[in-house]
Amino acid sequence: MAQHEVSMPPKYDHRAVEAGRYEWWLKGKFFEATGDPNKRPFTIVIPPPNVTGKLHLGHAWDTTLQDIITRMKRMQGYDVLWLPGMDHAGIATQAKVEEKLRQQGLSRYDLGREKFLEETWKWKEEYAGHIRSQWAKLGLGLDYTRERFTLDEGLSKAVREVFVSLYRKGLIYRGEYIINWDPVTKTALSDIEVVYKEVKGALYHMRYPLADGSGFIEVATTRPETMLGDTAVAVHPDDERYKHLIGKMVKLPIVGREIPIIADEYVDMEFGSGAVKITPAHDPNDFEIGNRHNLPRILVMNEDGTMNENAMQYQGLDRFECRKQIVRDLQEQGVLFKIEEHVHSVGHSERSGAVIEPYLSTQWFVKMKPLAEAAIKLQQTDGKVQFVPERFEKTYLHWLENIRHWCISRQLWWGHRIPAWYHKETGEIYVDHEPPKDIENWEQDPDVLDTWFSSALWPFSTMGWPDTDSPDYKRYYPTDVLVTGYDIIFFWVSRMIFQGLEFTGKRPFKDVLIHGLVRDAQGRKMSKSLGNGVDPMDVIDQYGADALRYFLATGSSPGQDLRFSTEKVEATWNFANKIWNASRFALMNMGGMTYEELDLSGEKTVADHWILTRLNETIETVTKLAEKYEFGERGRTLYNFIWDDLCDWYIEMAKLPLYGDDEAAKKTTRSVLAYVLDNTMRLLHPFMPFITEEIWQNLPHEGESITVAPWPQVRPELSNEEAAEEMRMLVDIIRAVRNVRAEVNTPPSKPIALYIKTKDEHVRAALLKNRAYLERFCNPSELLIDTNVPAPDKAMTAVVTGAELIMPLEGLINIEEEIKRLEKELDKWNKEVERVEKKLANEGFLAKAPAHVVEEERRKRQDYIEKREAVKARLAELKR
């Protein structure tokens, strides 16, 4: 084989390193699942991003974690399928397209359903391209041959199958229920499309008169306009204040309708007066109470948020205008006796910004209890879904145990059309996979399904289900891991689990890895209103995908939120730069060595033995941490090994044989360096794929790409604990000498006498054998290693395991001058300690200052005391 060529520019340039590499990976088909029967399958389906625009940092974080998992599994020899895809995102996409039309002076109704959907498909194609290019920039190892979209024909078939099946089992029904209604977009919303904001409102206290004229009962509300639809007043059955009133009637002010006082355990006796007005058509809890007591449901609003005919004289008014008028009228009647300021959480539409109206509406629903029960039972078995961190299982189960009916219809055009038809004459409902034969007599339901309905089927619909003989379904389902944020455990994770159990009889994934949200440096949620959002593509442009990925993967503990920090991304770029420079130095000193020439059998230095031992330890630790999804700890383990052990120590020590004349020693060190660098690049590859591929391609290597290079294995025969212990002692000595130099302001270039005293013969022999390293790194003017060494009066000392270091100060510094300088420094630290102790003794300061300010002062006090004691110790040494 010809001499190995190295092509690494002197300076690390992330743009040059990353340019073209992704296309090269795709061309090599390294990310495509092979179906190889000799390999175990490993599957992840990507949480499909909405096809509405740019990916944000949360997506970058989520997909980086998945890429780290799948890259490692691929290297471990699994047949990996990481399936990409996108979500049609119903209301989010429709709102964007409608906004575009509005700018042209058009509405969707001007176009009609068919033309509008054509426009939306065009939008989808454009933005899907943007998303793919962002995935490419991040370096995600996706199998594009299996890319899916939630409105693909195959997935649409799965949606119809599930709808029809649940309908026939009586688990999907059409009926009245309270839903989140957006009066601007005029559609039902899922809970995740509702944003809650703290609003300064009012609590209105009213007295409803008893129908027999014997008194009144007090109630309070934040929405007085809904009183027009009240059909009862509820009290707790055990409330002694109201027991005598249960069953009596109240005369509803303004309306004049008589409504009953009922007993229900839902009522909180401690809150307000302990009596609650019940409006079953405008509040979800009231709706449930109404069902229990067979109360009528009176809707007082239209779909656009104006009052309807049941609102009598207020008909046609906007709901908030109606509120003002009703308040005036109730005050005039003496019914409203108190208005108090009240800050409360109010739901707003994520899309239109409108205040959400809990609204009684005829919609399609899924009965959730039977589906939820199967998911709850699964968690009591050995085959349960494992949540990482474990605490999120409680969150998941709590939601399942308190589940409500799921409203699945949406008054939109973009989405999966509900496969239900109504007979034009009889009103009969027909539900099936295909339209009725005599279609001219039927009209299809105009609504579409909630986006979460189709995404709940994502793990198996993408594999070809309902065709259970599909090769991908048989091989890659169930999937292995789902990676997602804690904010969609209810909306998505839980629904995938119960649909997976219902339709495949299997859990859709073994593990659910939960991460938090990305926040800004101050811990605030990123939002358009705060203007604190960060575009991951901008970060990649400035620092590279490798730096961003490493930061995202290591920046928080499992399940915790991540604070974005430009400084930390920059520090990661510096880490990449360090790797580049160290690797380039190593490669430039390989002497053109080829892979076939690598030979680890030669006589090794103590540094060689140590780095090979440390590499084995790192491989073992990193592999174990990966199994537990400990990305942060795994990244830090690699960082410490690369920065400290490899770059700061081993490469520096390797310069001795590399620059020496012994060709055999040179060859062994080159082989060790190449072996360690190769394995280190593989360990780091899942985190930083671009730079590791670039360096690995320049190393003597076997194989086409690092993406498919085998995962490093511990090789016990390369560990030498005794030599590693010797190396640790050398490092301790060198560090101690460097610390002494720093303390006495002596630069490394100035020689310093070093006497090492040891009574341990083994230590003495080891130090004598490795004397060259001490001479290279301590720069001694004189080096003595013995059981007895001179002990001058003026000297600095340090103790390491098995030896005492003595460094004479005579001639090194002007001792009198140094004593004067240190006395001045001691005076300074005494004053600082006195000042901070005075502050901490001040009761006023302790009572008024924020906790973190007090804590900072305590930290300063500790720091100043430590510095003072160090100066005292140095003075004592010099005055001996």
UniProtKB/Swiss-Prot annotation:
Substrates-to-products reaction catalysed: tRNA(Val) + L-valine + ATP = L-valyl-tRNA(Val) + AMP + diphosphate
Gene Ontology biological process terms, A to Z: valyl-tRNA aminoacylation
Cross-referenced SUPFAM superfamilies: Anticodon-binding domain of a subclass of class I aminoacyl-tRNA synthetases, Nucleotidylyl transferase, tRNA-binding arm, ValRS/IleRS/LeuRS editing domain
UniProt: ATP binding residues: 528
PROSITE patterns (UniProt xref): AA_TRNA_LIGASE_I
EC number: 6.1.1.9
Motif 'KMSKS' region per record, residues: 525-529
Name of protein: Valine--tRNA ligase
Originating organism: Geobacillus stearothermophilus
Gene: valS
